[in-house]
Amino acid sequence: DHIAISAATLDQGVAAVESALGVSLAGGGQHPHMATHNRLLGLGDLYLEVIAIDPSLPAPAWPRWFDLDNFRGTPRLTNWVARCENLTGALARSPAGTGVPVALQRNAYRWQMAVPADGKLPFDGCFPALIQWQGDLHPARALPESGVRLANLEIIHPDADELRAALSSLIIDPRIQITQGPAKDLRASFDTPHGRRSLQ
């Protein structure tokens, strides 16, 4: 569905992505339930999201998604989100800690998303957040054409085999590559009007 670039501030995240990919991000909005805000980039039927804590909104009484409460450092690719038709069924096939469905809304968009109680997704955040959109509206369809497409998403983790097994019943996409490595890392490559570019 989309990939998430987390940032300490939205302006920092937008500047980093625009510099890396050589294109401008489009509008986004606020998520009052999580006290976050975002800007988006269309990737065909997918999109890229830059997300950060929104200091203008009151802090929630629960952990923010994508473990944003603990985010530090420069903007980076921290999470990916998998679209599903049946969130309840997908959660039944997912590891413990993937989350519980939370009904959310931003402007005309309505969706349910599995949000972990502590804000931290399984496999050190390498397991996807699960989302089910309500109705026919989807951000990717409303975003301007950017000329950017996701070429691949490489997920590096010490427990690569276990992660691959956990994903096997949820998603099959040749762009997703799961690699064994000493520490977790997410790397995305994009085909852009300026050639192949990457984010991590």
Regions flagged by a language model, labelled:
Residues I5-L25, L43-Q200:
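Glyoxalase I/VOC metalloenzyme domain signal
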Residues D1-H2:
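Extreme N-terminal starter segment of soluble prokaryotic enzymes
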Residues G29-P32, P55:
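Short, acidic/turn-prone active-site loops that include or flank metal/cofactor-
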Residues H31-M34, G181:
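A short beta-turn/loop motif at secondary-structure boundaries
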